[in-house]
C-alpha cells in the first residue's frame, strides 16, 4: 500500500512533540447502552489534531457532549467553534462577483435572444437562423437536462435499493456503454468522438478488471453509508434539492449560451449585428466566462452539499447514541456562512483546472475534425495531465471539506492538517482500496455519455441549417456531455460524502470505531483485515 505499508512494517511508533492533547477518556453512558468490552490496547486519538479552535477541551476530536444518552445536544454544541469567523472571505466575495457577472451577461444575451426570437425560431424546424445555434438547440438542451436529471435520480435510488450490486452494475454498464457508443461513432465516421470514447472504454474496462478484488470492502462501506442515510439526517432530500438547483442552473446556462450566439455571432443575416456589436472574439470571450462561472458554481454547489452531508455522518460517527436533532440544518448553515469562503476557494481551484481541460478538449476535437492526428495526440496528453491534476486537487478537497464541516477551519489549514493525518494514520490505504469514488465517476460518465449521444442523434435527425457541415456538432456534444456530467456529480455527492467522512473521523479518533461501532469494525476486519493496522493495532 505504498507509504502506509512502510509505516506499518517499520514498527516505529509515531513520536509527538509536547503540548498535544490528552487521550480521550469516554464517560460511561447514562442509559442502558452497554459499551463493548475493553480492548487490551487502546489507540490514542490523533494527537496533532484536529484543531481545537480555542475550545480547549483537550480531546482528540471536538464533540464534548456525545455520550449523554439522556439528552440530545445540538450540532453546534457537539461540534462547537469557540470563536467562529468567516474563513477565506475573499474567495466567497469573488464567487459572488463572478456569479453577478454571469447574471449580467445572461441578461444581455437573453435580451438579444428575445429581441430576435423571430429569427431564432420557436421550434425544432424551419428556423431562419442558419449561422449559429438557435431555438432548436435550446430544445435539445432541455431534452439533455431532462435525461440527466432522470438518470441521475434513478442512479442514486439504485444505490439506495441495491448497494451490494451497485458497484458491479455500474462498472459493467459503463464499460459496455462507452465501447458501444464508440463503435457507433466510428460506424458513423465521426472519428474524433469514436476514438476518444473507445480509449476511455478500454481504459475503464482495464481499471474495473483490476478493481474486482476490492469490491467486497467497497460494497461494505457503501452499504454502511446507505444504512446511515436511511436513519439519520436528510441525505436524500439534500441530494434532491442540490440536483434540482444544478439542473435549473444548467438550463439557465444553456439558454444563455444560445443567446450569446444569437446576439453576437457575426453573420450578414444576423439582425443583431446591425449596430456593429458582433464579433467572434466577443462570442469566444463571453462563452469562456459563462463556462468558467458554470464550473465554479457547480463545484461550489457540489462541495456545499458534500460539506453539509459530512456534518451528518460526522455526527453519526461520534454520537451514534445521541445524534443531534438538527444535524442537517446546522451543518448546512455552517457551510453557507462561516465556511462559505473556504468552500468557494477549494471549488475555485478545481474550476480553473476543469476550465483548462474544457479548452483543451475543444482544441482536441477541432484537431480531430481537421484530420491532424499529431495535434489531436498532443491535446490528448495535455488533457490527461490536467485530469490527473484535477483528481489530486479534488482528492484533497473532499477530505479537507470533511474537516471543515466539523471543525470550521480555513481551507489551506484544513487541507494541510487532514492530509498529514491521512498519511500518518495510514488512512490513505483505506481510501485507495475503496472504489466508491471511481464507481460514482463511472456512473457520472455513463450519464454524460448518454447526454452526448442524445445530442448527436438530435443533430443527426433534425439536421439544423446552422450545422449543415457539422461545424457545431463537437461543440453541442461537448456542452451536453458537460451538463450531464455536472448534474450527475451533484446528485451522487452525498453517497461518497458518507464514506469519506467515516475515513476522516476514524483517522482523528479510531477508538470510536471499535467502541461505538463494533459491528461495522468487525465486518471491516472480515473483508479487509488491514483495517486493524489502521484503526487499532498501531
From Swiss-Prot:
Chain ranges passing through the membrane: 89-109, 138-158, 166-186, 192-212, 240-260, 281-301, 336-356, 373-393, 435-455, 475-495
Bilayer disposition of the protein: Multi-pass membrane protein
Cytoplasmic-side segments: 1-88, 159-165, 213-239, 302-335, 394-434, 496-538
Compartments (UniProt record): Cell membrane
Record-level Gene Ontology MF annotations: transmembrane transporter activity
Extracellular-side positions: 110-137, 187-191, 261-280, 357-372, 456-474
Location of region: Disordered: 1-67
Domain of life: Eukaryota
Record has Membrane as a keyword: yes
Family named by the database record: Belongs to the CTL (choline transporter-like) family.
PANTHER family in UniProt: CHOLINE TRANSPORTER-LIKE (SLC FAMILY 44) (PTHR12385), PROTEIN PNS1 (PTHR12385:SF4)
Name of protein: Protein PNS1
Naturally occurring in which organism (per UniProt): Gibberella zeae (strain ATCC MYA-4620 / CBS 123657 / FGSC 9075 / NRRL 31084 / PH-1)
Gene: PNS1
